Amino acid sequence: MRTLWIMAVLLLGVEGDLMQFETLIMKIAKRSGMFWYSAYGCYCGWGGQGRPQDATDRCCFVHDCCYGKVTGCDPKLDSYTYSVENGDVVCGGNDPCKKEICECDRAAAICFRDNKVTYDNKYWRFPPQNCKEESEPC
């Protein structure tokens, strides 16, 4: 029961529709976003500041920027629709705003997949005090 409580608390600290984003990461990058990317570098996880530490952290920086450009819906709360066609994730639905959220999540999952080799354990649970440099613009 304690484990379930801990997982519920962790779920509250991740932006977006967590289950959809987690599912996309699993489908595309073939690893758990919750485990690998929820507390990595300066941008993977809740919030973000400073300079991205590597290509994987940059995936999260770009994802944050993408969410920041979404208008007309809430990327942190709204769900979207997608399908898998010929092995590729295709964002769909009639709501262009929700489709944009899906595209942000899809691009991040592809970025994680394409940058698996840059993942460095030294950035997992990276101390926030190491993220004090001025952030670059989106």
From Swiss-Prot:
- Identify the residues that bind Ca(2+): 43, 45, 47, 64
The active site lies at 63, 105
Q: Which GO terms of type biological process are on file?
A: arachidonate secretion; lipid catabolic process; negative regulation of T cell proliferation; phospholipid metabolic process
The note describing how and how many cofactors are bound reads: Binds 1 Ca(2+) ion.
EC number from the UniProt entry: 3.1.1.4
Cofactor requirement? Ca(2+)
**Regulation of this protein's activity per its record:** Inhibited by divalent cations different from calcium ions (cadmium, magnesium, manganese, zinc), since they act as competitive antagonists of this cofactor.
Where does the signal sequence lie? 1-16
Compartment(s): Secreted
Query: Pfam families, alphabetically?
Result: Phospholip_A2_1
Question: Which superkingdom?
Answer: Eukaryota
Protein name, as recorded: Acidic phospholipase A2 AplTX-I
Which organism is this protein's natural source?
Agkistrodon piscivorus leucostoma
